[in-house]
């Protein structure tokens, strides 16, 4: 396949890097807000294949991104395991605070039927891309077990997830059990996405940087290695991108020990240093500050130029260091793509 992102994930450095953006389908787009209003709720949108496929494709139509990423959420996995999830307006995800007894109550029997609408979305998007945008790669994704566990144990978003970390330190065997169950479910979930049409998989470990090096090895690197190995055994041609956000120097361990094809860099990572830390064949993805994108203009141009120079000659997918913020003018995204493709 000659798709630019697949070429980079095979270890090829392209003169113009392919580009897609985390949260490229989202509230900054007026067409997204229209569909979201129709759906009435985030879950109503994420579990409606027609609408979810539509918002997945919106940034492809508008900007010509090199990849479409499934419109969903990292917490759809606990939802599919029967673990209560709702999105409170203005507050984000809310879940019951997990206790040890809840670990064995996670309902694997409902996983496949509950993810069926999400898989239908993947299939719809892949079919439309093949017809209308054949150079565009479809990315499926999941939250990594540690990050998903953070939301489950703390009961939603929390500053530095103190309850999760306390639970992990004081009851490591139980926490191991939770991570193991989520690892198993993640393999099933991501494998189903490939079977439905995903060409690349991404593992988001948004809170990996909260852990000590010892805990990082146990609850970030080891599960990522297990997930990647299982997926490559089932789907040898499907590349995996890992994103251990805020991992700092532990990015090196993650890149060399997990088997991923590419590593996502958050905004704090110096791309020139990242190149030295990862094996030459491992692609890097990132890492423009989303606030530089929001600002646009000269500030954005300086940052883009710096990243491009640092990554010249290395396999690179241009992206952000975190998701697009809702206040971003769509014109700035168009300006970014023009900038990347004309430098």
UniProtKB/Swiss-Prot annotation:
Broadest EC class assigned to this enzyme: lyase
Superkingdom as given in the UniProt entry: Bacteria
EC numbers, comma separated: 4.1.1.37
Binding, substrate: 23-27, 73, 151, 206, 322
Record GO cellular component, one term: cytosol
GO biological process, one term: protoporphyrinogen IX biosynthetic process from glutamate
Site (Transition state stabilizer): 73
Cell compartments where the protein resides: Cytoplasm
Reactions the enzyme catalyzes: uroporphyrinogen III + 4 H(+) = coproporphyrinogen III + 4 CO2
UniProt-recorded Gene Ontology molecular function terms: uroporphyrinogen decarboxylase activity
Function: Catalyzes the decarboxylation of four acetate groups of uroporphyrinogen-III to yield coproporphyrinogen-III.
Family under the similarity heading: Belongs to the uroporphyrinogen decarboxylase family.
NCBIfam families hit by this protein: hemE
Subunit structure and binding partners: Homodimer.
Protein name as catalogued: Uroporphyrinogen decarboxylase
Organism: Granulibacter bethesdensis (strain ATCC BAA-1260 / CGDNIH1)
Gene giving rise to this polypeptide: hemE
